[in-house]
From Swiss-Prot:
GO biological process, alphabetically ordered: basic amino acid transmembrane transport; transmembrane transport
Main location: membrane
Protein's name according to its UniProt entry: Uncharacterized transporter C3H1.06c
InterPro entries (UniProt xref): MFS, MFS_dom, MFS_trans_sf
Ranges that cross the membrane: 90-110, 128-148, 162-182, 189-209, 217-237, 245-265, 284-304, 311-331, 355-375, 390-410, 419-439, 448-468, 483-503, 545-565
GO MF assignments: transmembrane transporter activity
Pfam families per UniProt: MFS_1 (PF07690)
Membrane topology per record: Multi-pass membrane protein
Superkingdom of origin: Eukaryota
Length: 589
């Protein structure tokens, strides 16, 4: 098909370039929205994609979804032909896995080393910002990464993110004071957020829907292992060497990942956008409001959970202005005529909205378990950092294995809805079983409850992501994945903060009227001479953590109910291989 062969069609070159594939033919054409609709296959009625949609992944003038969305016809994004580049997957996938491993590892690797770092740098009460700076920067950068990868190209954003991560790691290892360390952790977080976002998008670019679950399963296993191995690695390095090597160790590993991707990653070329067009069409109001809102809201949560003074003016200002900025972002996305950061049309379908919300709830539960089970083992069972990590291995191993099995199962059965529903049912049972974890519960019994919960959490990593990617056409995957990961990270951040609130308030209530207060270590509690008082305090700490698991139950219940509203899309996609001889292509960015 060649658009120029139609004598009656006047194409407007100012509307941008569109990449369109029919069978084995891939052509460039300049087009209006109506012209694109004319040229689409007859079966593909669900989406109206403009020329700018293919460049930015969003539409500056019209909704990305046509009025068909309100009808009862089936949305079938898989009718869009995906043009795949040729890649040596046995090299590219390990390169992507290495980068994901580093990004996930640095979220938790410092947890067991914080006391050593604070003592060495005289950190005092600012210790919490060592972890918060990373997660805050990582979460706030996510909306920007997806849209920029559409503007300047995937490779530029991915490689820049890895370089920023490595630079931040080197500077963290060289830090001489807490301010230096916290600022460089933020640089690390920006790089880590870009890595997380771009790896997900690149996987979607180089794999068809029918085999994609296998590769996302590999990434899920990598993420899960890195998250739980972090405390073990951090504790071992800080005890056996210097805490600075927690950061320096990233350099050779990250350098290898960068080299593999630079030399072996191939992507289908994308249209380039001039700086003038970028300034004219980019949604600066949207990116500023969402970034500011996320930062203010997460800072408010962090300060509130750290100090416990939720009614303080500073905390309320952060939270209120953060919510207002996020609300302003939502309003802006509905009415802006520029390229949207996150299209509201994606949330007009109940199925996709359910997936987005359940992703938030899933990571809320995952974060509460990941962060507060070690508190149980250390403060109540008397474990050290390393042994605490060993006792959480059942959570890590089972969750990672189920993530891989789930991905392979989806790829084999071509169905993500049933694994999603099954995962939520098991997760509800697992969170319910964790309510039975008391002060005197056997370690083996506790690990069994954790393993059951891990079956549920691990089974949900892949279905949610695949459901998002299967529900939108290829042009919208980047921004949809960014929205998915933003909500996922927000769920994790809210889970950590709410867990702290529940724990602190419950512990304060249980110890009220006694001479004991919150913040006691295991050795301090164990040294209480009166046996009945000692058991009372241990039970108070165990019940405070138990309240977190009680709250997780209704959260899991809501997630289970929402999973039934998820629609199963066809996991098959027409694929054509990109060849260097294809005309009209520029170098891949």
């Amino acid at each position: 098909m060649n658009p120029s062969s139609s004598p009656n069609r006047s194409l407007n070159p100012t509307r941008g370039l569109n990449l369109y594939s029919t069978g084995n033919e891939v052509t460039w054409f300049s087009s209006t929205v109506d012209e694109v609709n004319e040229l689409k296959p007859a079966k593909s009625k669900a989406f109206s994609i403009s020329a700018q949609d293919q460049i930015y992944g969003t539409s500056s003038l019209k909704s990305r979804f046509s009025t068909h969305e309100a009808s009862s016809e089936k949305d079938d994004s898989s009718d869009f032909t995906l043009v795949l580049p040729s890649n040596r997957m046995y090299i590219v996938i390990p390169g992507l896995m290495l980068s994901i491993f580093l990004s996930a590892l640095d979220q938790t690797v410092i947890t067991t080393a914080i006391p050593t770092i604070v003592a060495n740098l005289d950190g005092g009460s600012s210790y919490s910002w060592i972890g918060t700076a990373y997660t805050l920067a990582q979460t706030s950068i996510l909306p920007f990464c997806g849209i920029m990868s559409e503007v300047v190209g995937r490779k530029i954003v991915l490689y820049t993110s890895i370089v920023l991560f490595l630079f931040g790691s080197a500077m963290c290892g060289a830090a001489q004071n807490m301010l230096w360390l916290v600022l460089c952790r933020a640089v690390q977080g920006i790089g880590g957020g870009g890595i997380t976002s771009l790896v997900t998008i690149v996987i979607a670019d180089i794999t068809p829907l029918q085999t994609r679950p296998y590769y996302t399963g590999c990434m899920g296993v990598t993420w899960g292992l890195a998250s739980v191995m972090g405390p073990l690695i951090g504790g071992a390095i800080s005890q056996k060497a210097s805490w600075r090597w927690i950061f320096f160790i990233n350099l050779p590993t990250g350098g290898l990942s960068l080299a593999l991707l630079i030399f072996f990653l191939n992507l289908v070329p994308k249209p380039t956008v001039s700086f003038r067009v970028f300034l004219r069409d980019f949604d600066f109001v949207g990116i500023i409001t969402i970034t500011t809102g996320v930062v203010l809201f997460l800072v408010g949560l962090n300060i509130g959970s750290t100090t416990g003074h939720w009614a303080h003016a500073n905390v309320l200002c952060y939270l209120i202005f953060g919510i207002l900025c996020i609300a302003g972002f939502v309003v802006n996305e509905f009415y802006t005529t520029r390229t949207r950061i996150i299209t509201p049309s994606a949330f007009k379908t109940l199925s996709l909205t359910s997936v987005m919300v359940t992703s938030f709830l899933h990571y809320y539960i995952v974060s509460t378990i990941t962060y507060y089970i070690p508190v149980y083992f250390q403060n109540i069972k008397g474990d050290g950092p390393l042994m605490s990590g060993v006792h959480t291995l059942s959570l890590a191993v089972v969750s990672s294995l189920l993530s891989a099995v789930s991905g392979m199962g989806i790829g084999k059965l071509k169905n993500y809805r049933y694994p999603m529903i099954g995962g939520w049912i098991v997760l509800l049972a697992g969170t319910g079983s964790m309510i039975a974890i008391y002060y005197n519960t056997d370690i083996s019994r506790t690990m069994g409850f954790l393993a059951l919960t891990a079956v549920g959490t691990g089974n949900l990593f892949q279905p949610n992501l695949i459901a998002v990617q299967a529900s939108v056409p290829p042009a919208l995957i980047a921004t949809s994945c960014s929205a998915f990961m933003l909500l996922r990270n927000m769920g994790a951040s809210v889970g950590i903060s709410m867990g702290a609130v529940i724990y602190d308030q419950q512990l304060t209530t249980l110890l009220k009227g006694t001479k004991y207060s919150a913040g006691l270590s295991y050795s301090q509690i164990a040294s209480i001479p009166n046996v009945s008082e000692k058991n009372f305090v241990f039970n108070a700490y165990a019940n405070a953590i138990r309240m977190i698991w009680i709250v997780n139950c209704p959260v899991a219940g809501v997630g289970m109910l929402l999973s039934f509203f998820t629609k199963q899309e066809k996991l098959s996609q027409s694929v054509t291989e990109y060849k260097e001889k294809d005309k009209g292509f520029k170098d891949a960015p």
